[in-house]
C-alpha cells in the first residue's frame, strides 16, 4: 500500500481562527479528515503531521524515508521563505514533494515570493484555498 505524508508548518494549527479572509474558516483537523477519506477510497495511507518547530518537521521528513513514504504533501507555512534545513531534509530523503499554499504566495508581500522548495518540488499548488490540499492529494495519486 502506498503511503503519503501530509506536513503542515507553523501557524497552520490556527486555520479557521487566523486571518479567515485569507486562509478560510475550516480547521486543519477538518481538512485532514476530508483528505484521509479520499486516501481510504483510493486504498492509500495518509499520515498527517503539523508542527510550529522546524526541527520536528525535519525529524518527521527523515522518518518518512524509513516508512517508505511515496510522496510528501507539504505546506511549509512561513518556513517556505526561510528554511534551508527543511529543504536539505527533503533532498536528503529523495521522496517526491508537492508544495501546497492556501494563499497565492506570489500575490502577497514581496517577502513571501521566494520559496526554498519550489525548485525541488514535483509541483506547486498555490492560491486555491483548502482545495489545494485535495488537488495535491488527487494529483499525487495519479503522478506518483
Where are the model-predicted features located?
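Extreme N-terminal starter segment of soluble prokaryotic enzymes
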Residues: 1-4
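Glycine- and acidic-residue-enriched helix-capping/strand-helix junction motifs
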Residues: 15-29
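Short beta-strand elements in bilobed, periplasmic/extracellular small-molecule ligand-binding domains
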Residues: 38-49
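N-terminal small/polar loop signature for handling phosphorylated ligands or for N-terminal nucleophile
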Residues: 51-94
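Flexible, gly/pro- and Lys/Arg-enriched active-site loops
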Residues: 79, 84-135
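Conserved small/polar residues in nucleotide/adenosyl-binding loops
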Residues: 142-144
Amino acid at each position: 500500500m502506498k503511503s503519503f505524508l501530509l506536513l503542515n508548518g507553523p501557524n497552520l494549527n490556527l486555520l479557521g481562527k487566523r486571518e479567515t479572509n485569507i486562509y478560510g474558516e475550516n480547521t486543519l483537523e477538518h481538512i485532514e479528515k476530508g483528505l484521509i477519506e479520499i486516501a481510504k477510497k483510493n486504498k492509500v495511507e495518509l499520515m498527517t503531521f503539523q508542527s510550529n518547530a522546524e526541527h520536528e518537521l525535519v525529524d518527521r521528513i527523515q522518518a518518512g524515508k524509513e516508512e517508505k513514504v511515496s510522496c510528501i504533501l507539504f505546506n511549509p507555512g512561513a518556513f517556505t521563505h526561510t528554511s534551508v534545513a527543511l529543504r536539505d531534509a527533503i533532498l536528503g530523503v529523495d521522496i517526491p514533494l508537492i508544495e501546497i499554499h492556501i494563499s497565492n504566495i506570489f500575490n502577497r508581500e514581496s517577502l513571501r515570493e521566494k520559496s526554498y522548495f519550489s525548485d525541488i518540488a514535483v509541483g506547486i499548488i498555490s492560491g486555491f484555498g483548502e482545495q489545494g490540499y485535495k488537488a495535491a492529494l488527487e494529483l499525487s495519486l495519479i503522478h506518483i
